[in-house]
Amino acid sequence: MDVWINGKFVEAERAEVSAFDAGLQHGVGLFETMHACNGRIFRAHQHVERLAESARMLRMTERLHAEPLVEAAELMLERNKLERARIRLTITGGNLNMLQSTGTSQQDPTILITSQPPTEYPDDFFEKGIGVVFAAGRLSPWTPDAGHKTLNYWSRILALQEAAAQRAGEALWLTPEANIASGCVSNLFIVSDGTLITPPSRHEEPGAALPGITRAAVIELAESMNIPVERRRVPVDDFIGADEAFLTNSSWQVLPVTSVLVRTNAETEEGAEPSIEMRPHSIGEGGVGGTTSDLRSALLACIDRETGDQG
């Protein structure tokens, strides 16, 4: 399997990164995960442009250009003979001394593109939905990297491990005000009284959520289907009381959420100390809702249409 690193295709086992790379030394880096179908990448330019915007805003580099990176990613699909794939584009600060950097770096970044067969998720994920939990930490819209896809994934990995330990498929981040920001690796949508609602991204008021490419596609499709859409804060009670809920990212597309673990007072014997336990609470009727199903079908058709035969 070949990878693309700093302008060259090499075998994955021969790819090299400097021991002084800022991504390795300081965790300074950004990435994009993209979905390829029919040998083409879905909305590749939007992914790369989002990454370039983050690189500028976080003062990593101003010298990223979308077209060469999109071409390199598409060429890699051909070299690795992949019709369907998970594409990962990673950039780091390169050989950067963080203590001497006072503005946007003039150091060339390290750029790595990899491709792999996509993860195959169980059919039950999409036919029955998954359960989620609330992450223990908080996601603030006021931190400099809020809403950017950075390499700083430690807290998210810990939250996902805790979710897996409770047999949940995703952990939801709350803001300091106890509104839902997003999932660890996904954007959240709820459906309430026929309206599609999603927490604001960093482009919309100050939001902590990533402006997801799949999120944007779902919003476009919903509006084309005359489904009302609101981008607003989502308190926990609104999520728990929603008619439907689902998550979006490049790998899942649209993934239904049908339950959430919530804290409840456990029944105890008279005179015993009260205790708290976690119990599943159904979202809506506990099954995949009609709006969720319609939007998933519409998105899959959109992906197939945009990546299909252009000739």
Regions found by a protein language model. Name each.
Residues 212-217:
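Feature captures the catalytic cores and cofactor-binding loops of soluble hydro-lyases/lyases
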Residues 179-205, 211:
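Glycine- and Gly-Pro-enriched alpha-helical subdomains that act as flexible
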Residues 1-172, 176-179, 206-207, 219-311:
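Conserved alpha/beta cores of soluble small-molecule-handling proteins
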